[in-house]
């Protein structure tokens, strides 16, 4: 397969993004990527990440491509799952305890830390608002984290997310309770399950 065909295939797969590391993994040299970017007038959105001129930048996708350790959580994940209707005011993500996140702790970013035993519990991939797949916590993990950290959330957001989840046909109560036990919020979660289901 020709270099341009490989790159076009990668761009199509990533919704208009060309990620240098993925191109190199596919056998394309960095100089060939640079040449393609110049010839197709692609815009650089981050180190090693380029987009076509007709593509709107997706901050969540770009941030995660640059930082593979992050998992979207909190308000960001609640919004992506449709559990709250108001877009998140800041990007919230979780990283492993001990991870040095100073390079991404910037305006409108909230970094949370989790122990390795629970870090990957409940991870899944869903489309961002722009349609690119990003790694987030599933609905059940989001609800458990929400209940565990309830004082950090506005009451309206908290109530909306709980109500939306409990009234959803897609809820998985056995998984919710399993996570609640591991996160130490079983009693609080059971209170909502008993009252709202």
Region roles according to the model:
Residues 41-47:
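A short, conserved structural fragment
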Residues 25:
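Short, surface-exposed ligand-recognition loops at beta-strand->loop->(often short) alpha-helix junctions
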Residues 35-40:
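Basic amphipathic alpha-helical segments that dock to polyanions
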Residues 3-10:
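Short helix->loop/beta-hairpin flanking segments within DNA-binding domains
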Residues 6, 16-22, 49-197:
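Nucleic-acid-binding surface
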């Amino acid at each position: 397969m020709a270099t341009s065909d490989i790159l076009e295939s990668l761009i199509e797969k990533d919704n208009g993004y060309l990620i240098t590391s993925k191109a190199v993994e596919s056998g394309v040299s960095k100089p060939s990527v640079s040449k393609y970017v110049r010839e197709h007038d692609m815009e650089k959105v981050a180190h090693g990440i380029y987009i076509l001129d007709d593509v709107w930048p997706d901050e969540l996708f770009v941030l995660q491509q640059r930082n593979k350790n992050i998992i979207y959580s909190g308000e960001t994940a609640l919004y992506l799952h449709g559990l709250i209707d108001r877009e998140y005011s800041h990007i919230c993500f979780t990283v492993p305890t001990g991870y040095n996140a100073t390079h991404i702790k910037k305006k409108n970013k909230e970094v949370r830390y989790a122990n390795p035993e629970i870090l990957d519990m409940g991870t899944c991939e869903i489309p961002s608002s722009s349609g690119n797949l990003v790694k987030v916590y599933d609905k059940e993990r989001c609800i458990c984290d929400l209940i565990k950290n309830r004082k950090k959330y506005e009451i309206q957001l908290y109530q909306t997310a709980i109500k939306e989840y409990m009234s959803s046909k897609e809820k998985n109560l056995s998984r919710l309770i399993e996570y609640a036990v591991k996160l130490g919020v079983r009693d609080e979660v059971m209170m909502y399950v008993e009252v709202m289901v």
